[in-house]
Design a protein with these regions (language model features):
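Conserved Rossmann-fold NAD(P)-dependent oxidoreductase catalytic core, especially the SDR/UDP-sugar
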Residues: 106, 110-155
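N-terminal Rossmann NAD(P)H-binding glycine-rich loop of SDR-like oxidoreductase domains
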Residues: 9-37
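N-terminal Rossmann-fold cofactor-binding loop
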Residues: 43-48
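NAD(P)-dependent short-chain dehydrogenase/reductase
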Residues: 172, 176-228
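NAD(P)H-binding glycine-rich loop region in Rossmannoid oxidoreductase-like domains
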Residues: 63-106, 114, 134
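Glycine-rich NAD(P)-binding loop of the Rossmann-fold in SDR/ketoreductase-type enzymes
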Residues: 99-110, 157-158, 231
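Mid/C-terminal beta-alpha module of Rossmann-like enzyme folds, strongest
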Residues: 227, 235-298, 312, 328, ...
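Active-site Tyr-X1-5-Lys
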Residues: 152-179
Length: 355
């Protein structure tokens, strides 16, 4: 991997939405690190993080992008900015798809419109592998694969709609450089509590941590199988910094090797795989969701079963990007941190924080 020159980052003002979350925290670590050439970092969040690294050197602006009142905050947030990285995305409450759509899709539209109105030269939008249509398990897909998503997934539908909103706005403003980032599953140990609460809920998350034997030795995984990749949040942040430095445009897949099937996942975690028919797993998840035992709607399983693995050649070639962390190591470290209840001090990454 070529070293990042950072020549074009010198003196830039960079605005980051969703700056206190999983990816936002990783990006702030880079942009505010000693020796960073970035002149100013602005962060947008619903709640102000504590005044500790990496949040303490950020100029914070507070608003909820799902509310029209945010339209009065965004102009000041984006005034004089050289680039905005839009990371803000709500995963909960999963039982309120209307609320999620307002925050995620309409909020994205608000940010991009405000960026164009403020004359921001570069807009980077964080998307996801979930925008891709179902693909073959035997090959990785490039950025030209159809972006129609997995229809049964609320998350996937909103990601597709958010990308469409970005295209709709920037398509009328060719003077603005637009970048769309489509990573595979993004993990880091510091986000273990955040992700555990999002997908297991506080009750099952706490129970899973107290029952390590049951939690760590048997792993029901679907038949016929899965093909899943993982990438460390720090490696995604590295790619984002390279996009800012080079003002790279267009879509970029981000994934680390290896792509893992069900057996590889079980081996990595030291578990015993229990092959389970996919319809049975989905029915169990649907029942648990209906009974309010978990906050995870069944569409998440559909993404895991159907979303294709990603080819990151474009990022490697145009950005000289290569992840420093192997995907299997990222998964193993994350699950270990999940068992320890590991977190960071931000309002989203801290297990005592609200959603």
């Amino acid at each position: 991997m070529a070293e990042l020159s950072r020549d074009h980052l010198q003196g830039l003002t960079v605005a980051v939405t969703g700056a206190s979350g999983n990816l936002g925290t990783a990006l702030l670590r880079r942009l505010t690190a000693p020796g960073s050439p970035v002149a100013e970092v602005r962060g947008l969040a619903r709640r102000r993080p504590p005044d500790v690294v990496p949040y303490d050197l950020v100029d914070w602006h507070l608003t909820d992008l799902g509310e029209t009142a945010s339209e009065h905050v965004l102009p000041g947030f984006l005034d004089g900015v050289d680039a905005v990285v839009h990371l803000a995305w709500a995963l909960q409450p999963g039982r309120r798809p209307d609320m999620l759509h307002r925050v995620n899709v309409e909020g994205t539209r608000r940010v991009v419109r405000a960026a164009v109105a403020a004359g921001v030269p570069h807009v980077v939008h964080m998307s996801s592998l979930a925008v891709y249509a179902a693909g073959p398990r035997s090959q990785k897909v490039t950025e030209d694969w159809p972006t129609t998503g997995i229809p049964s997934s609320q998350y996937g539908r909103d990601k597709v709609d958010a990308e469409r909103a970005v295209r709709d706005v920037l398509g009328r403003h060719p003077e603005t450089t637009g970048t769309v980032v489509r990573p595979t599953l993004v993990l880091q140990p510091e986000a273990a509590s955040e992700i555990g609460r999002y997908f297991l809920g506080p009750l099952l998350y706490g129970a899973a941590r107290m029952l390590p034997g049951a939690f760590t030795h048997l792993l029901p995984l679907p038949l016929p199988g899965v093909a899943v990749g993982f990438v460390h949040a720090d490696d995604v942040a590295d790619a984002l910094e390279r996009m800012l430095d080079r003002r790279a445009s267009g879509p970029f897949n981000l994934a680390a090797e290896p792509t893992m099937d069900a057996d590889a996942i079980a081996r990595t975690l030291g578990m015993v795989r229990v092959p389970t028919p996919a319809p049975l797993l989905r029915a169990a998840l649907s029942a648990a969701y209906t009974a309010h035992l978990v906050p995870t709607e069944p569409g998440w399983l559909d993404i895991g079963l159907n979303a294709p693995a990603l080819d990151s050649t474009r990022a490697r070639m145009l950005l000289d990007w290569a992840p420093k962390h192997r995907g299997d190591e990222v998964l193993a470290e994350f699950v270990a941190a999940l068992g320890r209840g590991e977190s960071a001090p931000g309002p989203l990454l801290n297990p005592t924080g609200g959603l």
